[in-house]
């Protein structure tokens, strides 16, 4: 049995869960749980604590029993008059060497440019600014949406 209590210097999450039929994954073959292709994505991501906001995770990161936070590394939301996909998965670095990240980015961008991209949950800019990334306050700006 693996536990952060017994192995405190290792990652404290227990895998991911997702709706593999969600249109964001139409061009990204996956199961509803972390499989081989999630290895690179998970080691190149940060889990975001979304306990206090109305985030709709596309990928739910399973927290351990000690902290039991609502975690994600990919979610969608309406913000004001707009809508967004928030990713704390690195989908920009060395994509020529990371085919899985490249394919997830491709699938998410196709989804965002489709009629299916209609997030049902509302969050505010204040909610985004309050997100915690690895226990530290994160800063977000308009520059974050550009490569």
Summary of predicted features, one role per range:
Residues 2-99, 117-122, 126-147:
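Catalytic beta-strand/loop cores that center a nucleophilic Ser/Cys/Thr
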Residues 100-113:
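Short amphipathic C-terminal alpha-helix that caps PH/PH-like domains
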């Amino acid at each position: 049995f693996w536990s952060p209590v017994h192995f405190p210097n290792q990652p404290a999450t227990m895998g991911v869960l997702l709706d593999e039929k969600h249109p964001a994954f139409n061009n990204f073959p996956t199961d509803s749980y972390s499989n081989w292709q999630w290895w690179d994505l998970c080691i190149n991501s940060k889990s975001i604590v979304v306990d206090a906001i109305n985030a709709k995770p596309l990928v739910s990161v399973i927290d351990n029993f000690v902290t039991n936070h609502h975690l994600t590394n990919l979610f969608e939301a309406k913000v004001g008059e707009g809508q967004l996909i928030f990713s704390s998965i690195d989908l920009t670095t060395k994509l020529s060497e990371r085919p899985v990240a490249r394919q997830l980015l491709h699938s998410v961008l196709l989804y965002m440019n489709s009629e299916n991209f209609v997030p049902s949950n509302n969050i505010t800019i204040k909610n985004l600014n309050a997100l915690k990334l690895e226990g530290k306050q994160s800063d977000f700006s308009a520059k974050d949406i550009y490569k």
